[in-house]
Amino acid sequence: MGLSPAVEKSTLGLHSIQQYEPLIGRAAVARILDKAARLGPAHLVHISSTFYGGGVTEILTPLTLMMNALGIATSWHLIQGTPAFFACTKKLHNTLQGDPMAFSDEEIAIYEQVVSENALRLHLEDCDVVAVHDPQPLPLVGHFTDRSMPWLWQCHIDLSTPNAAVWNYLRSFVERYNVAIFSLPEYAQALAVEQRFVAPAIDPFSAKNTEMSEDESLACLVRHCIRVDRPVITQISRFDRWKDPMGVIEAFRRARAEVDCTLVLLGNNATDDPEGQVMLETIRHAVDDGIIVLTADDPLLVNALQRQAAVVLQKSTREGFGLTVTEAMWKGAVVVGGEVGGIRRQIQDGENGFLVSTVDQAARRIVQVLKDPGLRQRMGARARESVRERFLLSRLLEDWLDLLAAYRLHR
């Protein structure tokens, strides 16, 4: 019996850098293979807070497979936590993106206690490099004082305007690492340790991004009761206030007053995000007959929506890096994104997408695209090429090979 289409597509190319040759060229593939060979045996351990939902998971899932396929032993461990712990770490996330709320002594105690319990479960004696992702497991480094291997902390959050008090607290942990890695240079902080900058990337061979025919994508939308006889506008993201779903709904309503269209909000909630369900309920109370809210965990639906949408929105008010922006651009979509964080590095306004700061600007761009069918084709072609050049997983893989070459423990 053959694999289901979802399984078959989800495994295409995950293990082989050679799959990328038609996209990045033979010389780039050879360079990556040479870097991996020169590293020799190495063991890298990633530590994060969830296997499900969110950008870190989207990145580490294919990256760990590709590194193992290259002969770099790469493991991925999760920390466990109580609902109270994840409520605290969500608050940390929000404050790092500029929320002015305070982090109480009780919350600090919960945060540090749960991380200390997780340290007891981790056995890292045989690895060459430890990579810790985002604030949730950050204090782990303090529980391995006799460590001999380098520790790297990678922050995937928009740190352009962090809450000063909370950042000062977390900085005491960050400065115990050998290096802090941020998505963009504008997130750099005043730190006593080295800082590096590594932008995220997408896997073009995953079920979410692999090629899909017009008939396949239309059929997928129909299965989910999405009308295909009028233009579709979509935003695909976590249900999170930083993604501004209420602003998306308002921009859509203003655009719909001029051009008939449908809005599809598709999202899921990561297991380390306790606020998501509250936001989802808020959205559901705000919708009307022209707005569809879906929570399906279906990468093929994401693929189909990004291919068929007349406009893809990512109207974030904070965004470390918009993976959904890159995914949609890879499919030749016109993306209207918030003029914040990493989105400003992904979209060159008016060239390969549009940047907006207000609801009214978003509505005007939606109408502009709907009234100019050729614009999507012209702008979409430039969008896809910019992703091919800068934001494919092969580039991220090479960045990690360079990090390992610089920091690994030579036994």
Range-by-range predicted roles:
Residues 222-243, 263-264:
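Conserved donor-binding/catalytic core segment of Leloir-type glycosyltransferases
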Residues 317:
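Aromatic "clamp/platform" in nucleotide-sugar-dependent glycosyltransferases that forms part
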Residues 368, 375-390, 396-402:
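A short, well-ordered alpha-helix in the C-terminal region of glycosyltransferases
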